[in-house]
């Protein structure tokens, strides 16, 4: 597991600093998984423990929600010999536009990072509407908390991280006043994060 964290750090996919999460909460760390996807060999190495667990399961299809899950679904399929497909948004609704799931096919959702598991519910709905069976989620990084587990079981992850996050008014980093708050998704995020260390 520490090997996976080192892989993420080696390609700047694991950032430390002061971050504004999409939930509005603050965190001292952030996983920018697109940076891992730049390096196929590192991505393959990070996904190896997930693929090993996946081989033990009776799975037909690995489904990656666009955008974050596409590469991971493909890599898991490559390592396990399964079929990979992806869901995508059309008019802001998650759907299966380019592929088909056959009734009764056993599906696994492949995600980059799972924090609450809520976003995977859309993909689960798509799988079930197509007649497939959603067995659970696999991910590179599992950030779920015991007090707030994912609504869909996480069957395998490459790395389990217990990263605290805070309401803005309770954030100890803000109270310290030393690190600027980095807004996620900005083009300067990686550079700002490095400057704050």
Go through each PLM region and give its residues.
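PRPP-associated nucleotide enzymes
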Residues: 1-197
């Amino acid at each position: 597991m520490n090997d996976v964290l080192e892989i993420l750090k080696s390609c700047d996919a694991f950032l430390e600093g002061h971050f504004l999460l999409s939930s509005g909460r603050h965190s001292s760390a952030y996983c920018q998984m697109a940076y891992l996807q730049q390096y196929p060999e590192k991505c393959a190495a990070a996904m190896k423990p997930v693929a090993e667990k996946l081989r033990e399961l009776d799975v037909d299809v690995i489904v990656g929600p666009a955008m974050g899950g596409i590469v991971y679904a493909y890599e898991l399929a490559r390592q396990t010999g399964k079929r990979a497909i992806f869901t995508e948004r059309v008019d802001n609704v998650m759907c299966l536009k380019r592929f088909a799931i056959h009734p009764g096919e056993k599906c696994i959702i492949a995600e980059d990072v799972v924090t609450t598991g809520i976003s995977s519910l859309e993909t689960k709905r798509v799988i079930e509407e197509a007649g497939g069976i959603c067995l659970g989620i696999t991910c590179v990084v599992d950030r779920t908390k015991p007090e707030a587990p994912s609504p869909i079981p996480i069957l395998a992850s490459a790395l389990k991280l217990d990263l605290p996050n805070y309401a803005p008014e309770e954030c100890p980093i803000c109270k310290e006043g030393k690190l600027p708050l980095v807004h996620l998704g900005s083009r300067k995020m990686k550079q700002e994060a490095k400057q704050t260390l």
